[in-house]
Amino acid sequence: MESSDVELDFQRSVQAVLRELNTPNPALQSNQGMWRWSLHKKVERNPGKSSILVRILLRELEKAESEDGRRVIIPLLLTLMSVLTKATGIPEDLYHRAYTFCTRLLTLPAPYSTVALDCAIRLKTETAVPGTLYQRTVIAEQNLISELYPYQERVFLFVDPELVSASVCSALLLEIQAAQEQQTPEACMRHVVSHALQAALGEACHTGALNRKLQASSRRVLEYYFHAVVAAIEQVASEDSPSRLGHLEKMEEIYCSLLGPATTRRHCVGDLLQDRLPSIPLPSPYITFHLWTDQEQLWKELVLFLRPRSQLRLSADLDALDLQGFRLDRDLARVSTDSGIERDLPLGSDELPDPSSSEMERAALQRKGGIKKRVWPPDFFMPGSWDGPPGLHRRTGRPSGDGELLPGVSRVHTARVLVLGDDRMLGRLAQAYYRLRKRETKKFCLTPRLSLQLYYIPVLAPQVTGQDPEASRKPELGELASFLGRVDPWYESTVNTLCPAILKLAEMPPYLDTSRTVDPFILDVITYYVRMGTQPIYFQLYKVKIFTSLSHDPTEDIFLTELKVKIQDSKSPKEGSSPRRRGAAEGTGAELSMCYQKALLSHRPREVTVSLRATGLVLKAIPAGDTEVSGFFHCTSPNAASATDCSCLHVSVTEVVKSSNLAGRSFTTSTNTFRTSSIQVQSQDQRLLTLWLDKDGRRTFRDVVRFEVSPCPEPCSRTQKSKTSALNSHGQETEKNMAKPNSLLMPINTFSGIIQ
């Protein structure tokens, strides 16, 4: 195909992606997302034409910038970065052009400036040292051993077998296994060596002879050249002013050593013309498939992810921790019971210095510390400290927050937890996330070495043919997915459209032959999402205290999307009560007393207490429309706003209204709505309540007389509590400031975050 034909084909595909992004057509929802995938496949089949697609994408980006078409900037920019990560032979002027464009976006508000900064950092490294992005991505995602680049990533795919059908689970598992059986460590190392040499040498690289040599090499030889290539790239990339010429000389030495001088001398123009540039695939990440059947399964899998790398040097403090985390927690403080005078310690004590040391020559009286506490960074308990400083996001192949929370301990592991399902699955994820954060306050095990990233792909039950869509989808189980699609158009086009393809895959007969190359659409979309979805949206978790008796302690639980309340069937009236005094309305609903803090735009506290008769109420934490998205409901950074700024419940109460007319009394129902950050509800008569959390029938609480809902606070450690009590002795003002904990926010990664 001629270059003009290829350019025209690429141009049509890019325009189709933009049309789908700007004017989504619900009638073609089953085919949405295919244009982006087919565009990437065209480049993979003809990698020598990658520079043509790069020019087209840059032209469309500059056009969108001039016409203020911000809706398409982030999708085009992420598509460009995906192409540049895989491609070789891109002219240097295109890298500089892309880098300059990203620097201009830094003047725009978030999320454009945030995504542009992330892309600019990667482009600067790739321009100086071609092949860096590809190499780091493969090493991290495939868990290849490298001392110079020790970062490791893993994708944990969690599916609840009670919410997702067995056919969907088996179809996904077979597709993942079929792709990963072709991604052996030897194949990945061959890809890294071949890509690095082609990216550095360009047309001077004899690709045919290189690939034949790599295929014939033993594992020992392959590992030798793999480590040589990694060392050459990482050493140059770590320099303050990388020299592209020096990098080229090192890669030429490796190339000549691998092929030998005789082969390199025979490399002539005729060989170059006959040697078509081969496609070097970028392997999909290492994915593990899990059926979520245990409440502690997420914690256990994360701990097992860290254990194989136990040879990494850790601080003495972390070495003392129990990595499994299943034994009793050790105390964070050691309280001395002696007099505090070193001379009074008994002989043989472990705290006595060696007699030959110089410490014995010091004064006989020395104070010993009465309390020895472990000191953590002041903000590591906050959600932002799990992912590094706010505003700094992950680079490809390197997990976010890759600095050191503790001296000598680097966060070289990234766990990408991907859940499939509906809102009920997200409620289960919220429970696991809360338990994990609470456990970390007692045993600081995962946080210093692990960057946790959460992803969500909606998988909803198919609609019944011939049934009303509204009737077949009650209760609505995809509210959070709809919200993510409204605030992030690229998430809507890429991820929300994946559900029909997954259901279609489950209906197809299984293909058990894994020997031939597969071209999996679903796995490719998952790979694109976990690589490019770096911008989190933080959701407020809510704690609910449930009382079945006012004289007993409440049961506590959390929810993410919804709490639904129904009135249970009425019990028999108490003896002595007069049936004559029971009106018609006595059998409808229950008398409820509600006390809530009304949410106002001014954020001024206003407490409201009201009593009414109602048949039920619903508390929703997800905004229903675009007008509510642009308000103060959600925030894209855990430190961007206070809890009152980014937490708001939408309460709908079905109230029983009594009216009188000439025909007599009549009772109707009306729905009242209001917004609040916390609420307390108590039944005033003999009617009991039933609560459903996150639309999950397994999380049902019956015979409830009272419940209280408020933003879930960040779990607090004993160290923080002792610090708070110490500060309280200095004054009441300090106590007031320290008593209010921060709210616990759960991040879900998207492509752009919230676009206002």
UniProtKB/Swiss-Prot annotation:
Chain's gene name: Pik3r6
Query: In which compartments does the protein localize?
Result: Cytoplasm; Cell membrane
Cellular component terms, GO, for this chain's entry? cytoplasm; membrane; phosphatidylinositol 3-kinase complex, class IB; plasma membrane
**How is it placed in the membrane, per its record?**
Peripheral membrane protein
* Predominant subcellular localization, coarse grouping: cytoplasm
Q: Where is the composition biased (Polar residues)?
A: 717-731
Give positions of region: Disordered.
570-589, 716-738
Task: Please provide the Gene Ontology terms (biological process) for this protein.
Answer: angiogenesis; G protein-coupled receptor signaling pathway; positive regulation of angiogenesis; positive regulation of MAP kinase activity; positive regulation of T cell differentiation; regulation of natural killer cell mediated cytotoxicity
Tissue localization of expression is: Highly expressed in heart. In a lower extent, also expressed in brain, spleen, lung, liver, kidney, prostate, thyroid, salivary gland, dendritic cells, macrophages and neutrophils.
Q: What is this protein called?
A: Phosphoinositide 3-kinase regulatory subunit 6
What is the documented function of this protein? Regulatory subunit of the PI3K gamma complex. Acts as an adapter to drive activation of PIK3CG by beta-gamma G protein dimers. The PIK3CG:PIK3R6 heterodimer is much less sensitive to beta-gamma G proteins than PIK3CG:PIK3R5 and its membrane recruitment and beta-gamma G protein dimer-dependent activation requires HRAS bound to PIK3CG. Recruits of the PI3K gamma complex to a PDE3B:RAPGEF3 signaling complex involved in angiogenesis; signaling seems to involve RRAS.
| Single GO molecular function | 1-phosphatidylinositol-3-kinase regulator activity
What is the scientific name of the source organism?
Mus musculus (Mouse)
Supply the InterPro entries for this chain.
PIK3R5/6 (IPR019522)
| Leader peptide range in chain numbering | none
Assembly description: Heterodimer of a catalytic subunit (PIK3CG) and a regulatory (PIK3R6) subunit. The binding of PIK3R6 to PIK3CG may exclude the binding of PIK3R5 to PIK3CG. Interacts with beta-gamma G protein dimers. Interacts with PDE3B and RAPGEF3; form a signaling complex that regulates phosphatidylinositol 3-kinase gamma in angiogenesis.
